[in-house]
Every structure is written in structure tokens, then in C-alpha cells.
A protein has these predicted regions:
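PP2C/PPM-type serine/threonine phosphatase catalytic domain
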Residues: 1-236
Length: 236
């Protein structure tokens, strides 16, 4: 999926990728909302937690719930409170899915960006990431993974998890964006398949967005072992 929309005086180009990789099924889910008539654009990536059953159910439930809340509230300015309310809706959605499946445990991460004019609101729960890069300055912002190390294992410390709303606490940041800025939303299957300097250098390449994701796709196929999903955005 790719395209270009216009928000106020800015154009927003984007392209996406989501692949199973070496796993048996794809537990990632993503969505893009294009709302130029409301001066808005929104992208979201969710990564179902493979250590639990129904990861793909969890990621789809949260992705759909937050997308629906955002679309139903286009007249409400972006804010921390708006993100928190969307996350509450997502918690309700994952709880309902768990109930429907005999109280099955399920969980997912989430990362999103909402662009309103020249303002970008970035929120995440878990270890899916957002990168914001500017041609003249390089990396402006990278989300901080919600993980801890237990006995040498990485454990996701915040996520959307059935009947555990207290761990679905988002980090939220707002930025003023400029023409030329690039934003990447991705699951850990993508960024763990390449060195950080390679990822950032490729994001700033003077190439079409589709060509950049083609490089990421190649590296994930060659070096990755997980599902991988990304939304790459450029402000024109």
C-alpha cells in the first residue's frame, strides 16, 4: 500500500510493508487512515505477542479499535487525553476478544503517529518503534522500548494484554514536523534485522520510499526470523 495525500500546505507520502518472514503466520497488523478533509493522517502498527496464543487476534483488535476511535473523533484535536481514551477502547476490545475465546491470554504492542497540520503525535506501548528523522539533523526521536531483562530474556513490560489494562500505558510525544522529515513505524522484526546506523542511513537515502522499504525487505528476509511490518512516511 502506498500513496500521497495533502494535509493543509503539506503533502504526505507513505508506503507500507507487512510480511510473515520465517514464521508460520503473521501476527502483525497495521492500518493507515487518510483524512485530508479533516487535515489529518494516521498510521498504526501492532505486533501480536508470539509467546501467547492468538497474537494475531490481539494485534487486529487493538489496531482496529484505535483506528476506529481516531476516525470517529476527527473533530477532536490530537492530545495526550485522546491517545489515552483510544487506548482504553483498545483494552476493552482485547478483553472482549479474550472473553469470546474462553478467556484466552493474548497480547500485542502498538505504535502510532497522528499528523494534524504540522503537528505529529507519536504514541507507543511495548517494543514496536517510531523513528523521526530530518535530513539536516539526522535522528530527532526514537521511541524507548518498554522491555526489561529477566534471567537474560527480554520481556515486554508494557503492552495491551487481556484483562491487564494497567500495563497498557502509552508514552506520548508531540513534535512540529517540517518538509523533508521522514517517519518510520515498525515492529521489532524489522529493526532487529539490521544495525541501527544502517536503518537510519537508509531512511535518509535520496530515493523513493518504496525503494527504501525494498532494502528493508531484503535485509529482513536475509537476516530476520520474525514477522516484519513498517509504515514509512515522508512530509513533502
Amino acid at each position: 500500500m502506498h500513496g500521497t495525500i495533502y494535509v493543509k500546505t503539506m503533502g504526505i507520502k507513505y508506503t507500507t510493508i507487512s510480511k510473515t518472514g520465517r514464521r508460520s503466520n503473521n501476527e502483525d497488523c497495521f492500518n493507515v487512515l487518510k483524512m485530508p478533509e479533516h487535515n489529518r493522517f494516521m498510521g498504526i502498527v501492532c505486533d501480536g505477542m508470539g509467546g501467547h496464543s492468538f497474537g494475531e487476534v490481539a494485534s487486529e483488535a487493538v489496531c482496529n479499535a484505535i483506528s476506529k476511535y481516531w476516525q470517529d473523533n476527527t473533530d477532536t484535536p490530537d492530545s495526550d487525553q485522546k491517545v489515552v481514551m483510544a487506548c482504553k477502547k483498545a483494552c476493552n476490545a482485547i478483553n472482549q476478544k479474550s472473553y469470546d475465546l474462553s478467556h484466552a491470554e493474548m497480547g500485542t504492542t502498538m505504535v502510532m503517529v497522528s499528523i494534524e497540520g504540522d503537528k505529529a503525535t507519536i504514541a507507543h506501548v511495548g517494543d514496536s518503534r517510531c523513528y523521526l528523522l530530518r535530513q539536516s539533523e539526522g535522528l530527532l526521536y526514537q521511541t524507548e522500548d518498554h522491555v526489561r531483562i529477566d534471567f537474560g530474556w527480554e520481556i515486554v513490560s508494557r503492552c495491551f494484554f487481556s484483562y491487564r489494562p494497567e500495563v497498557a500505558v502509552p508514552d506520548i510525544r508531540q513534535f512540529t514536523i517540517q518538509k523533508g522529515d521522514r517517519i518510520l513505524l515498525c515492529s521489532d522484526g524489522l529493526y532487529k534485522s539490521m544495525a541501527p546506523d544502517i536503518l537510519q542511513a537508509r531512511m535518509l537515502d535520496d530515493k523513493p520510499l518504496e525503494d527504501i522499504l525494498d532494502v528493508f525487505d531484503f535485509l529482513c528476509q536475509k537476516q530476520g526470523d520474525d514477522n516484519y511490518t513498517a509504515i514509512l512516511i515522508e512530509i513533502e
